[in-house]
Amino acid sequence: MADSLISAFDAVLSDLDGVVYTGPHAIPGAVASLQRLETEGVRLGYVTNNASRTPAQVAAHLRELGAPAEDHQVVSSSQAAGELLASLLPAGARVLITGSAALAHEIELVGLVPVSSAAENPVAVVQGFNPEIGWKDLAEASYVVAGGALWCATNTDMTIPQARGIAPGNGVLVAAVAAATGKTPVVAGKPEAPLFHTAAKRLNSDRPLVVGDRLDTDILGGNRAGFTTAAVLTGVDTKETILAARSDERPDYLLADLADLYVTYPQITDDGGTFRCGAASAHAHDGIVTVTGAEDDLDAWRAACAAWWSAVPDASTARAPRLEWRRH
């Protein structure tokens, strides 16, 4: 019997929202899949752009859901932001917090002083997601940023998956300050590589697999870090958006969910421009991908991705082909 996909890796660096849970609820099957990693001898780390909670709070939530999680296994964008600002500012520098108490805590841990008003003369602004942020908070940040202060965003995710649907993420709030000031922040979290390198180092991993639901953060960040990436279909991105992905956001593997880690990934072969995966096949010509297989068969989408990405290897923007489906 062929080896499972996970057998080629010594660790999983997993995203949270859209991979492990959506809103307050675990994604079906996700907890069991995470629990199984230990029996397979694979280490587990969580890499998240959620800056509204501390790593300890994130780990506690994961344990409530039944997932295996210790505090040190969680690496957040708020931690990355704290480390970045500490490397750029003198100890004791004042930093305006446009975000959560958890973000303020991370800033304090690195020897900086969190403040809440432009009147306190901060030399930097750090902006992270907090569902309670309002106009006054964004105005305070804008005053300080416009005055020339260093501006750091924990992440620029434009959306965040919730139980009721897709909601605006931190990137939308960052964009409001950018529109008001004409400035651009430095970004500490995904899709930048250091967050992934830090997580892999903590796990002493040489062969990590990055698993995420978002091309623009998880997959792009994992690719930038030089790690193997897998996209799951339990969150934001879909089969269609993954097929259309720009080159640097294309995953190495396409999975339905975390349970697919434990099955053999089908081999994809190139037969003179026709790409075969399982019983499905696909070829690309003149912006059209012709797929032989069923639309609900993931192997058909894997073949379609292989064909399209081979035909358009250097896509700087997302570009979707026209799909033509044929039955066997």
Give a label for each model feature.
Residues 18:
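Receiver (REC) domain active-site loop signature in two-component systems and cognate sites
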Residues 2-14, 22-24, 28-31, 35-39, ...:
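Asp-based, Mg2+/Mn2+-dependent phosphohydrolase catalytic module
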Residues 50:
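Conserved phosphate/oxyanion-binding catalytic-loop motifs
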Residues 43:
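Conserved phosphate-binding loops in N-terminal lobes of ATP-dependent enzymes
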Residues 47:
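Glycine-rich loop-to-alpha-helix module at the N-terminal edge of alpha/beta enzyme cores
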Residues 77-79:
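Polytopic endomembrane small-metabolite transporters, centered on the Drug/Metabolite Transporter
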